């Protein structure tokens, strides 16, 4: 189902529930994988592991970046990477560039996901808002919504680097 862009969270939830109900009427067993359910902890844990792998690859290459910039929607990737880096005592800082939400909303989501993952992994390391940065300066018309400014940026990137990027990036 295609839904209108720029829906608020409540409208998205209603749409998800409508699709779930339609599928249930067809005899299927659909589930909405909400970011606060077990799925969220599993996704976050995967990125805790990814932090260790990333640090290994960086060590092998001899590179020591001070920041790791990533896109952040629900915050699970940022939570896992930041938790993993902190647990492994890496000075690298996660810079979570928000795709849709504002920092005051996304920051506690990242903390929540990290806390659940740490609990499941039985880590004593805990993440706080001091351990990562949420950048919400680039949230515009919506995640992946093509605007004239975005189209211009895509053309500029294509000319400069010889490749076309997806509007999400």
Locate each region found by the language model:
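PLP-dependent amino-acid enzyme catalytic core
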Residues: 1-169
């Amino acid at each position: 189902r295609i839904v209108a862009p720029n829906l608020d969270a409540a409208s998205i939830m209603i749409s998800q529930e409508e699709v779930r109900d339609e599928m249930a009427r067809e005899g299927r067993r659909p589930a909405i994988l909400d970011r606060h359910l077990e799925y969220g902890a599993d996704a976050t844990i995967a990125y805790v592991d990814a932090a260790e792998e990333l640090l290994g690859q960086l060590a092998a290459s001899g590179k020591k970046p001070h920041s790791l910039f990533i896109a952040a929607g629900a915050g699970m990737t940022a939570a896992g990477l930041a938790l993993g880096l902190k647990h492994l005592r890496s000075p690298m800082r996660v810079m979570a560039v928000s795709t849709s939400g504002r920092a005051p909303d996304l920051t506690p989501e990242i903390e929540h996901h990290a806390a659940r993952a740490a609990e499941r992994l039985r880590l004593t390391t805990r993440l706080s808002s001091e351990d990562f940065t949420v950048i919400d300066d680039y949230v515009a018309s919506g995640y992946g919504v093509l605007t004239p400014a975005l189209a211009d940026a895509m053309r500029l990137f294509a000319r400069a680097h010889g490749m076309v990027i997806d509007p999400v990036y």
